[in-house]
Amino acid sequence: MGHVLEFVQADVLARMWRAAGDPVFFSTGTDEHGQKIYEAAQKAGQKPEAYIDHYAAEFQKLKQLLNLSSDAFIRTSSPAHIAAAQEMWRRCAGDIEKRSYTGLYCVGCESFKTEKELVDGKCPLHPSLVPERVSEENYFFLFSKYQEKLLTYLERPGSIIPEWRRAEAIAFVKGGLEDFSISREKKRLSWGIPVPGDDTQVMYVWFDALTNYISTLGWPNDEKGNFKKFWEEGEVLQVAGKDQVRFQSLMWQAMLMSAKIKNTDTIFYHGFITSGGQKMSKSLGNVINPLDLVEKYGTDAVRYLLLRHVSPTEDSDLTLEAIHDHYTAHLTNGLGNLVARVMKLCEDNLDAPISVPEGMQGAEEITRELDNFSFNSALEIIFSRIAAADERITKEEPFKVVRSDPVRGKLMLSALAAEVWNIGRLLTPFMPATSEAIQKAVLENKKPENLFPRL
């Protein structure tokens, strides 16, 4: 669910910026190397290559199922990405040295842990996994060298959203940075990108995976000019889960500094989604499959549920019961019912479609909320307009007036149709298919098919 949440959040922002006339490059993808992938493939009785092909195909399905407007899907097993990761290594070579190392490795996080990061000897994010004590010769990135430069980067408000994640990152850096391992011995882990010039080592998965942010743009060759346009000259936003602050805001930024590449402008972190107050787990039987939700409720309903009823930045709890209640109350009885009522009255009583207004009432408020990554607040503004339109119908009773005073009644219906049109346009980045259906209904002066059937 976390991946689906960030895909949809990023899609809303991409659609908003495109609508404003800004060029956008929106990329998603899959990290396909590392011990976790290798062990999962073994468990499935497959070779890593076959396993990741299936894994990537499942993620690629999400583009259609969630109606994502993404421009690229980057696989870290692709030849272009492998070449980019190796070039990143070469450009960081002045900050890389080989050392012998012993440490505790969490396969779930794909990272080494210090004793102070563990709770009762286990990773707090993966308590079912016992960290593996690893002793081997690895290449290390001189992370400690970048302490002051990272603090300077983090001092800029807006470098990390929300603000308390920025404070968390600053505190981590001020606590002192330790150089970190960026390779594994090939004899222990063969599934990885080869280290340039050393056949005995493969890259640590995070060094490889983080490079996807620029490999997807065609770096280092940049034959299409996308890297220059969107990274060097554009404004770069990364969307990630709260457990990635150390990797995205510190490790990756230090790598970029070392390679003399511009740093990310903003990184937005979302919270976790729990179910019934607990982390989703097959053993607990509380896993919510987003694909099942799309099949039952439809794409736009799932987008709505994630954007309005999940906090953009804090942990949120979702249950199947709550999802059904939100769907019924806000989509079936709310938005869907309003559009059906108004357009049925218009179809029966107006001689022609209304002349739709050019502007959008409330657009500036929506943009302001989205600029602050407040997806839920933006939707609350739109749904308050839906509630207000419902109240207007109840109070003014246009269905009666149109019979007793046709001229006044038709004016009332035209005004309601204009508001339905306005609501439809405001919904465009959040619920694009629903937005299109609403606008089509107003332009044709017809009641649409049931937008959100009662389930």
Sequence positions of predicted segments:
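Structured secondary-structure scaffolds
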Residues: 1-28, 80-87, 122-348, 354, ...
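Basic, alpha-helical terminal appendages of large translation-related enzymes
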Residues: 25, 29, 46, 101-104, ...
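Short, glycine/charge-rich beta-strand/loop segments that flank catalytic centers
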Residues: 72-83, 98-111, 269
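The −1 position to Zn-ligating cysteines in a subset of zinc-ribbon hairpins
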Residues: 91, 105, 112, 122, ...
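Short, flexible, mixed-charge glycine/proline-rich loop motifs
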Residues: 93-102, 111-118, 134
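Short Cys/His-rich local motifs and their 1-3 flanking residues in nucleic-acid-associated proteins
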Residues: 94, 108-111, 125-129
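Short acidic alpha-helical/loop segments enriched in Asp/Glu that coordinate divalent cations
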Residues: 344-359, 377-381, 393-403
